[in-house]
Each structure stands twice: as C-alpha cells, then as structure tokens.
C-alpha cells in the first residue's frame, strides 16, 4: 500500500493568553490522529502557529508597554511547557506575523483580485469618539441582527453562528469605552462570497459528504437559503465578506492600499500554509512542489465555534486563488464538566492544564480520558472527576497496565527474561486480538478514539479472563508446571504488546516505556501480526503508571482563594515619594473662571477663560463636560497648574490645567469634581 502524504493543522490560538483546556483537548485529538497515521507508515507534517494579529493584541501590547511583536513572542515562549507536558508533538510552531504569512496572504489576495473576487466599497464604520479610533469587530458589541441574542461581537454571533457586518448590530456599544459608537465612512475591500461561482462551489463542497461531518454539513446548509431565526425572523443567503481594517491596526498591509490591513480572519488560516512553508524551508524542501502534489491530503482540526470561517471563507479563498482545498475540516465540540456545566475557575469547576501538570498528574491519564470520550462528531464532551478516576484506575491501570505486571515478573525471574512457546489456547487468544487491528485502525482514521479505546478495553477483558482462568501465580507454586507458566506468561506479554500498539497513539510515553521493557524498536500497527516469538529477551518490568488519587482531583478543582482586595484610595496606588524640591517645581495658583463655554465638536471638553491675577486671562480646555454645565462654573474659584507648558489641541491652545478629582475606575465610580478653595482666596495666590 502506498504511503499517504498528509498535512495537518489545529486552529491557531490567539496570542493574547495562555492555552486553556479547550486548546489542549484539540491538540491531543489531532496529535493522536497524526500518531495513528504515522503508525500506518504515512508521511505527515503537523504544524501549528499563534494567531498574532488584530486590534486586541495591539491594545494589549500597548497596555503592557511592549511592541505587538514582543508581546506575541512573550506569549509564544510559554507554549512549550504545555505541549511537552501533554506529549503533543507539532513538527513546527510559527506565528501569523512571519515573513511567510505576509507573502502568502498578499499573494492569495492578489490572485483573488485577479479572479474578480475582490471589490472595494465605501462603507459606514463604527468609530469610538472617546478613544478616537475605528473599532475592530471584537470591540463592538450589541444585539445579533439574526437571532437577537444580546452582547454579541461585531463580526459573528456565538449563539446562532451568523456572520455579519458590525453595522448590522442592534444597539451597538464600544467594548473599550462603553460609548455609543458613531458611524464614519471608509473604503473597504470585500471578498465576493455571494458570487455565483463561490455559491456553487461551496454548496457542492460542503454538501458532498467528503469534507465535513454530516451534522456540520446540515448546519452549513442553513446558511445558503432562507432560514428561520429563534425569534421568528428570517435571513437569506451568503453575504460578501469585509476583509479589510483601517489603521491603526497590527496586521498585514493590503497591497497598494496604504493604511488598510487584512482582517485577522483572512490571514489567520493562511498561517497554516505559512507554518508549513516555514517548516519546509528549514528542511530545504520545495513548498510549491509539496503543495502541487495531487496526492497531498489537507486536514484542519477546529472547534465548533469557528465553523463558518473554515467551511465557507477558507475553502473559497483557496479555490478561487488557484490552490488546493482542504480534504477535511474536523470539527469537535467543547469540554464541559459535571454533566454539561460550563467550566469556571471561580466555582472550582475549571481545569487548568498547568495546574494539572504541577500537581504531578500523569498527562497520559488525560490523553486516555479524552481519547475515551472523543468520537469524531461535533459533540461536547464532559469531564466528570469520578468518571475520570474510574476510567483511569479501573480501565487503564486495572485492565491494561496490570496485564504486564501479572506476567513480566515470572518471565524475568523464572526464565531469565526469555519468552517461551505459546500453546493453542494462547494462540487463539492472540488471534482474536490481531483480528481487531483493522477495526481499531479504522476507528482512529475516523477520529473515533472512543471506539478504538472501547474495542481495546474489550480485548483487555479477554486477556484478563485468560489470566484469571490460568492463574500464573498458582502455576508458579506447582512442581512440573514451569513450561505452562512460561506459556501463559508469554501469552500475556505477547497480548500486552498488541494492546500497547493499539493504544500507542493515545499513550505515546507509556508505549515508549513498554518498548524499552520489551526490548523492541518503536512499533507500527502492522507489527501486531508478528509475535515477539520464543527466545525473545525482555527486560525487567518497571511499574508504568500510578493511580489517580482523590486528593489530586480535589486539589485540581479546588477554587482559588478569595482575593483579599487591597484598599487603594480612589482606585489607584499612592504615587512614589518625591522631595519637597520636586513639589516646588509645580506652580499651583488660585484661578477665577471668568467665562465657561461648551466646545463645538467635543462631548467631553469645556473651554475655561481663567483669571490668574496676571492682568490677562488664560485659555484652558478641561474634560469635565460630563459633570458640569458652563453656567454652573462661571464666576467660581478653582485651582490650576500655572507653569504647565502650553499644549496645542484640536480646538485651540490650552495654557494650563484645572485640577479635578475622580476615581481611577470612572465606570464603576463615575464623577469628576473640580477643586474649589475656601472663601477668601484670591486669583493669583500660590498654593504651598
């Protein structure tokens, strides 16, 4: 059989935080599938990357005092401990700000443009008047225009999975400031997903039964025609896709369009190809030749929350830019806890991957448990601590690991570590185990690891029944039964080897330890057909795995201790200590507000005309319009910084600063309070 050539990816994690258990579940699922493919002799390139672009990262980097590139690099530096910890073996890990991704994204765009799939339109776009910037989709929230779910993002609804323009939202608000955004016009670039060519292709591609699971295809089908929303309204057809964003933005510039950048969801999936190209470049291999091979298969493992981008936009981008489309999009559900409850760290139902490892919990316990749950369908899986303990302790250790421990000691001590001949009853048992190789490999192929585990555990039951029937511990006590003891124990070791091969994609570390114990090279599925044989030398058995304890599970799900809120006056720390000389540099004066008026074009500022006793007035702008009307301030005394350098503003020159008090968290503690001296103070008096 000719070896298959396969390219595999997982969804790109957004580079603004650590991995969560959902990431780890997906990576374990994909890693297991990749290992199963390699155990069939197939050539697989398995790549991942960080999704590095977008306004959220740009804003987070600014808050952290870093460049976006350094912010992403710091996040990426923490990935290895997770991947190594759970035995997840990517061939390459890159990020979407790589030179390869810039090059490929821009070329795909140009190819789509040449094919007539890109057009420009002047659109109205939301702008935050307080932050003075166009708002990215994820920083606009409001009511979904399709199903009317509240607090949905500006690009897609997490309830009904609809994709729409931010301007379609009902009652939108800025997630940055809470302000109601205003509409401003801007020229944007659109991918014409509604083009009849795209609709025809996507209809066939998503509904032909080859590329997505049936339940996913059924959901996608709703998006092509008229569909009824939960509130009774209807929506129809595929919409064109806005693929551009305005500066300031951290991303990839659109060719020949200064100040315009690709929307993150255009260049993010291209990151799959870019990470592969980066890998092949390191190896000195030709990326274009690799991708041009008609036998190449392309698989993407993703969560159900990003189906739209991977089953509509991504295949259409590839198809109409002249590239290979995915062989299959493999969609999984979410992980819940305790019979469907959403995970929550504060309630003690969150599963923190690093905490799991820090508690000394075996990563292959989790790999096995997830393997026993994942079935290749787009279904949520539930983590139940009691079920976890039972499956690990009773099944994995009690049924599988203990087979070796019940036989290996006798072989090593009584027969010098050499296997013997297997009699007819043992051969019959081993034949039954070997007969299941095809179905188990097929289960792995279908990503139905639950079936692969279930079938393997049934085989473990047969082997344990054989052990119980033949009682090697009693044979060891009987004179003249050495040959039978060696026969029975050899059968157990041969069976254990077969079972280990079946579980190897899920338990790579255990399989490696078993290979050392059996003194065999790393084995593939086909090798179950060949016995180790009489005379084969094995090593001394070392215990493979400890049992899960209740204490570990209690600690894993222990809610964090309630945070003791530090008393911070006014919501912000007292500033660092200064000297009296430092303070003396600031010239604070009593000022009279001679005139106060609103500033046209600003909702925040008031223009104050101040008498500071200089014989002439000063002009100062102050952001206090939300709390004071001009007539309320006119004639009042206040305090100003008189020696602050004048600042040129959009509305004029500001010649100082009026002092006002406010809480650091103005949303939670609204209010701005202008300082007013006691009666008797006169304009121009200095404050000491």
Curated annotation (Swiss-Prot):
Annotated family: Belongs to the class-I aminoacyl-tRNA synthetase family. MetG type 1 subfamily.
Keyword Methyltransferase (UniProt): no
Motif mapping: 'HIGH' region: 13-23
Record's subcellular location: Cytoplasm
Name this protein carries in UniProt: Methionine--tRNA ligase
Subunit structure: Homodimer.
Family annotation (Pfam families): Anticodon_3, tRNA-synt_1g, tRNA_bind
Job of this protein: Is required not only for elongation of protein synthesis but also for the initiation of all mRNA translation through initiator tRNA(fMet) aminoacylation.
Cofactor note: Binds 1 zinc ion per subunit.
Organism: Acidovorax sp. (strain JS42)
Lineage, opening ranks: Bacteria, Pseudomonadati, Pseudomonadota, Betaproteobacteria, Burkholderiales
Chemical reaction(s) catalysed: tRNA(Met) + L-methionine + ATP = L-methionyl-tRNA(Met) + AMP + diphosphate
TM helices/strands, residue ranges: none
EC number: 6.1.1.10
């Amino acid at each position: 059989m000719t070896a298959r050539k396969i390219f595999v990816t997982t969804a790109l994690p957004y580079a603004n935080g650590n991995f969560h258990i959902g990431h780890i579940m997906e990576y374990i699922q994909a890693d297991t599938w990749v290992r199963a493919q390699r155990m069939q002799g197939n050539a697989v390139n398995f790549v991942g990357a960080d999704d590095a672009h977008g306004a959220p990262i740009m804003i987070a980097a600014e808050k952290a005092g870093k460049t976006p590139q350094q912010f992403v690099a710091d996040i990426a530096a923490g990935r290895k401990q997770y991947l190594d910890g759970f035995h997840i073996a990517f061939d390459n890990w890159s990020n979407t700000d790589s030179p390869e991704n810039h090059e490929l994204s821009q070329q795909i765009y140009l190819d789509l443009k040449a094919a007539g799939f890109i057009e420009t339109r002047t659109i109205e776009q939301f702008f935050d008047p307080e932050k003075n910037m166009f708002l990215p989709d994820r920083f606009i929230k409001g009511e979904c225009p399709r199903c009317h779910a509240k607090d949905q993002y500006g690009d897609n609804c997490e309830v009904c999975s609809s994709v729409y323009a931010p301007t379609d939202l009902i009652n939108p608000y800025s997630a940055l400031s809470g302000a109601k955004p205003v509409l401003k016009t801007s020229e944007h670039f659109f991918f014409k997903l509604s083009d009849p060519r795209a609709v025809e292709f996507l209809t066939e591609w998503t509904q032909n039964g080859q590329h997505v699971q049936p339940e996913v295809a059924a959901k996608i089908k709703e998006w092509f025609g008229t569909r009824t929303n939960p509130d009774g309204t209807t929506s129809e057809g595929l919409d064109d896709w806005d693929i551009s964003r305005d500066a300031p933005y951290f991303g990839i510039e659109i060719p020949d369009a200064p100040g315009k950048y690709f929307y993150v969801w255009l260049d993010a999936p291209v990151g799959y190809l870019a990470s592969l190209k980066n890998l092949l470049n390191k190896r000195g291999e030709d990326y274009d030749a690799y991708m041009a091979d008609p036998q190449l298969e392309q698989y993407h493992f993703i969560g159900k929350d990003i189906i739209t981008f991977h089953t509509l936009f991504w295949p259409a981008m590839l198809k109409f830019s002249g590239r290979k489309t995915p062989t299959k999009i493999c969609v999984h559900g979410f992980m819940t806890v305790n019979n469907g409850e959403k995970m929550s760290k504060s309630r003690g139902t969150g599963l923190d991957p690093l905490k799991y490892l820090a508690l000394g919990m075996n990563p292959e316990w989790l790999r096995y448990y997830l393997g026993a749950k994942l079935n290749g369908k787009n279904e949520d899986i539930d983590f139940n601590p009691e079920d976890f303990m039972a499956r690990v302790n009773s099944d994995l250790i009690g049924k599988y690991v203990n087979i070796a421990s019940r036989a290996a000691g006798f072989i090593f001590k009584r027969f010098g570590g050499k296997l013997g001949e297997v009699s007819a009853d043992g051969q019959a048992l081993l034949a039954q185990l070997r007969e299941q190789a095809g179905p188990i490999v097929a289960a792995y192929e279908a990503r139905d690891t639950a079936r692969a585990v279930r079938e393997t555990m049934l085989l473990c039951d047969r082997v344990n029944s054989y052990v119980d029937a033949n009682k090697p511990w009693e044979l060891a006590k009987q004179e003249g039964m050495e040959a039978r003891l060696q026969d029975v124990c050899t059968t157990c070791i041969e069976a254990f080897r077969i079972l280990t091969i079946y579980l190897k994609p899920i338990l790579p570390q255990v399989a490696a330890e078993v290979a050392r114990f059996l003194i065999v090279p790393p084995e593939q599925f086909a090798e179950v057909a060949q016995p180790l044989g009489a005379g084969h030398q094995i090593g001394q058995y070392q215990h493979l795995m400890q049992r899960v304890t209740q204490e570990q599970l209690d600690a894993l799900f222990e809610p964090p201790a309630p945070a003791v809120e530090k008393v911070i006056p006014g919501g912000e720390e007292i500033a660092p200590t200064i000297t009296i000389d430092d303070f003396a540099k600031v010239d604070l004066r009593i000022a009279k507000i001679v005139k106060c008026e609103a500033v046209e074009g600003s909702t925040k500022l008031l223009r104050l005309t101040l008498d500071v006793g200089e014989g002439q007035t000063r002009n100062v702008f102050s952001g206090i319009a939300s709390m004071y009307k001009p007539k309320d301030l006119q004639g009042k005394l206040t305090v100003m910084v008189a020696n602050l350098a004048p600042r040129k503003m959009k509305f004029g020159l500001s010649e100082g600063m009026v002092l006002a008090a406010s809480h650091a968290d103005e949303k939670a503690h609204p209010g701005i309070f202008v300082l007013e001296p006691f009666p008797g103070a006169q304009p121009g008096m200095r404050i000491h």
